[in-house]
From Swiss-Prot:
Functional note: Regulator of type 1 phosphatases which maintains protein phosphatase activity under strict control.
Stored Pfam families: PPI_Ypi1 (PF07491)
Species per Swiss-Prot/TrEMBL record: Debaryomyces hansenii (strain ATCC 36239 / CBS 767 / BCRC 21394 / JCM 1990 / NBRC 0083 / IGC 2968) (Yeast)
Keywords linked to the UniProt accession: Nucleus
Top-level taxon in the UniProt lineage: Eukaryota
Record's protein name: Type 1 phosphatases regulator YPI1
Primary location group: nucleus
Compositional bias of kind Low complexity: 1-19
Chain residue ranges for the region called Disordered: 1-135
Compositional bias annotation for Basic residues: 110-120
GO biological process terms on file: glycogen metabolic process; intracellular monoatomic ion homeostasis; mitotic spindle assembly checkpoint signaling; regulation of protein localization to nucleus
Length: 135
């Protein structure tokens, strides 16, 4: 602090030694914006050898079990999930048998190809006879 005798004013200098904490803002994920993602484990095989681990398969294969054999998955499923898998089971069984599969997989049924209607046979541009107007 210093005093100037001619003006009778006082000047003081304060130094702020406090450090303010840094605030990091993050977007809060909500249920609407959070999309379910597939998490691949290290034992997933990359069949195409292109360093891609993704699947376009929508059907789940359920192998046959011996009588009396239980699975840990069946006890963990809710009634909604088991109802959903039963919806496609009848359709998947018929599709699986016709496609060479064992018929044990539950399928969504979206793999059926639409049969095209046979097109009417029409001549192409080279086969058509030109029409002449009478003069």
């Amino acid at each position: 602090m210093s005093v100037n005798p001619s003006n009778n004013t006082t000047t003081s200098t304060e130094t702020n030694t406090e450090t303010r904490p840094i605030l990091h803002l993050r977007n809060k994920k909500t249920d609407k914006t959070a999309k379910p993602r597939v998490r691949w484990t290290n034992d997933v095989v990359d069949n195409e050898n292109m360093d891609k681990k993704k699947s376009k398969i929508c059907c789940i294969f359920h192998p046959q079990r011996e009588f009396g054999e239980s699975s840990s998955e069946s006890s963990d499923e809710s009634s909604d999930e088991s109802d959903h898998s039963d919806d496609g089971a009848g359709e998947g069984a018929s599709n699986g048998a016709s496609n060479g599969g064992s018929g044990n997989d539950a399928c969504c049924g979206n793999h059926k190809r639409k049969q095209k209607k046979p097109r009417k046979s029409t001549p192409n541009a080279y086969e058509k006879q030109p029409t002449y107007k009478n003069k």
